[in-house]
């Protein structure tokens, strides 16, 4: 092990790593220690996340969008046809809450018909490629856990009809977890306990994979970022793209009208005069229930993790560091004796960057309202709210079949 790594282990009094001061460290572990950012350890002593002053931010509502739809559509279609729009699928998660141990996008959302989440999202994107005759570059962010299976799944299913030359994969960066005393946790004898760096880390991970060159070579000027767990995501939506361009904003955020003041979604707002997202738990009752003159909620539009960013602005903020958020989580680990521990309560800190900070670092952002029944079908739980059941119902409501009619048994004789 390199002397400088040993010095850091000693200086930070690493309980689970001390034995490697005298023993030979596994190659994988040594590489992790060499490449990790040790300054993360200082953050656990300054965990408070300071937010600024929130104020409402008006959205472009459905009525205004409809009134100007032809103009926005023409502008957006022109951008897509000229190869200026790319898409980023954030797909690093597992389907754990669905009782599914593979990549979440591999989950079959159909009832008796095979309909995978990845398949439906690609079908949504294909609407635009069919409309424009142009393949939209699709960049899929995976994680260390599901990268191999995700790539294989796309290959096995022939990319669900998409042009494979326009699909690139990259792996989300991982960061170490530490216990409440600042000790780096070990997942195994040869590896730290690592976790993804949050949904704000996607652009840095894309750059580290060398795909910024691909963006430049293809002439991509706008990136539409969307999450894997909403099967009704409309991607590279030309009306959204056109409205954002016409507004003069450098970013756009798709939003839905909240069901009630306390719906558990982040709301678009201004923070110290800059575009931002206030989390539902950060809203005071007064803010949550505050209304405009027309009776609508001042913080009444929730984000659905579908954003549009101008690439040159992304490149500019990539040179700066996004704030790191420290969150408490349950992290399995092995101790210095090799004994495995699976805690039932939070035992460690994880470090995450958040996409809301990317929005905040933009000069402006257009909140763009969409019909929640047409564009918001989250798949977060096996049953109940935002579940497989509710997503299927919304798919069917939008004319997307989840039933295979070859499975239906027709009666051989009708009773009169």
Residue ranges of model-derived segments:
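Conserved beta-loop-beta/alpha segment of the NTase-like Rossmann-fold superfamily
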Residues: 159-160, 164-263
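Extended hydrophobic secondary-structure segments that form protein cores and membrane-embedded regions
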Residues: 87-90, 137-143, 168-173, 223-226
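Low-complexity, highly charged intrinsically disordered N-terminal segments
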Residues: 8-66
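Catalytic core of tubulin tyrosine ligase-like
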Residues: 219-223, 232-236, 241-403
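Conserved small/polar residues in nucleotide/adenosyl-binding loops
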Residues: 406-412
């Amino acid at each position: 092990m390199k002397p400088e790594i040993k010095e850091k282990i000693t200086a930070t009094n690493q309980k689970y790593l001390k034995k490697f001061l005298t023993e030979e460290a596994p190659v994988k572990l040594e590489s992790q220690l060499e490449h990790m950012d040790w300054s993360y350890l200082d953050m656990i002593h300054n965990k408070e996340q300071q937010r600024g002053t929130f104020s409402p931010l008006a959205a472009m509502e459905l009525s205004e969008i409809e009134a100007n739809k032809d103009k926005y559509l023409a502008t957006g279609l022109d951008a897509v046809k000229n190869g200026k729009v790319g898409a980023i699928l954030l797909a690093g998660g597992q389907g754990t809450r669905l009782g599914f141990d593979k990549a979440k996008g591999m989950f079959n959302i159909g009832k008796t018909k095979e309909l995978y989440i990845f398949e439906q999202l690609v079908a949504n994107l294909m609407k635009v490629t069919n409309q424009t005759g142009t393949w939209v570059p699709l960049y899929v962010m995976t994680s260390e856990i599901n990268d191999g299976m995700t790539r294989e799944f796309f290959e096995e299913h022939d990319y669900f009809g998409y042009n494979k030359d326009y699909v690139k994969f990259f792996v989300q960066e991982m960061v170490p977890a530490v216990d409440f005393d600042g000790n780096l946790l070990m997942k195994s004898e040869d590896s730290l306990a690592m976790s993804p760096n949050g949904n704000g880390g996607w652009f840095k991970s894309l750059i580290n994979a060398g795909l910024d060159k691909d963006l430049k070579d293809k002439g991509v000027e706008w990136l539409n970022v969307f999450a894997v767990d909403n099967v009704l995501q409309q991607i590279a939506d030309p009306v959204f793209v056109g409205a954002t361009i016409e507004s003069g904003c450098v970013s756009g955020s798709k939003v839905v009208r909240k069901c009630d003041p306390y719906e558990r979604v982040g709301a678009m707002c201004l923070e110290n005069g800059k575009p931002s997202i206030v989390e539902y738990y950060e809203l005071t009752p007064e803010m949550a229930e505050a209304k405009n003159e027309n009776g609508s909620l001042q913080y009444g539009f929730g984000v659905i993790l579908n954003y549009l960013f101008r690439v040159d602005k992304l490149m500019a903020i990539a040179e700066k560091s996004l704030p790191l958020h420290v969150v408490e989580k349950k992290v399995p680990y092995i101790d210095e004796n090799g004994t495995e521990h699976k805690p039932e309560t939070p035992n460690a800190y994880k470090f995450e960057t958040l996409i809301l900070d990317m929005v905040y670092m933009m000069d402006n952002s257009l909140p763009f309202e969409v019909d929640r029944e047409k564009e918001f079908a989250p798949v977060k739980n096996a049953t109940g709210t935002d579940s497989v059941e509710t997503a299927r119902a919304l798919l069917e409501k939008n004319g997307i079949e989840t039933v295979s009619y070859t499975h239906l048994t027709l009666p051989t004789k009708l009773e009169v």
